[in-house]
Regions:
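Key DNA-contact positions within bacterial/archaeal DNA-binding proteins
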Residues: 33
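Minor-groove-contacting beta-hairpin "wing" of winged helix-turn-helix DNA-binding domains
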Residues: 54-61
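Short beta-strand "wing" residues that participate in macromolecule-binding interfaces
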Residues: 50
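N-terminal helix-turn-helix DNA-binding core of bacterial DNA-binding proteins
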Residues: 1-30, 59
Length: 131
């Protein structure tokens, strides 16, 4: 859910900034406890910046031509995995030490998804009229 909220926040800030946390929360109906957590993680990854004061608020810091959806996902997930069995420390109770057919399929799907998320820059995702 945090990644979904992050994309909504980035969409708002892409089109108008700076915006306060309260404005972002209201516009996208994101509960206050979540908005601050998401904003903090995006700021920690240098995706957003905050300006204090009466005309302050949150703004995009990262270049949206270079920032990818994968970068946004990684701001919230330590590792990008589609299923638990792809974790390096996962012990499968069904197949001992061997990678089963499902594991190989999930690994391939993960590879494809990661590639696509790395290709999808934020500018292309957030444009009003994508080509």
């Amino acid at each position: 859910k945090e990644v979904e909220y992050a994309v909504m926040i980035l969409d708002e800030l892409y089109h108008e900034s700076p915006l306060s946390a309260a404005a972002l929360s209201t516009r996208r109906n994101i509960p206050s406890p979540f908005i601050y957590r998401v904003l903090k993680k995006l700021e920690a990854r240098d995706i957003l910046e905050i300006r204090r004061g009466p005309k302050g608020g949150y703004s995009l810091k990262a270049d949206c031509e270079k920032l990818t959806l994968y970068d946004v996902i990684c701001a919230f997930e330590n590792t990008f995995i589609v299923t638990e069995c792809l974790k390096s420390d996962y012990e499968c109770v069904h197949n001992n030490d061997f990678n089963c057919r499902m594991h190989r399929q999930f690994a391939w799907i993960q590879h494809l998804l990661k590639e696509e998320f790395q290709k999808a820059n934020l500018s292309s995702l957030l444009e009003e009229d994508p080509e």
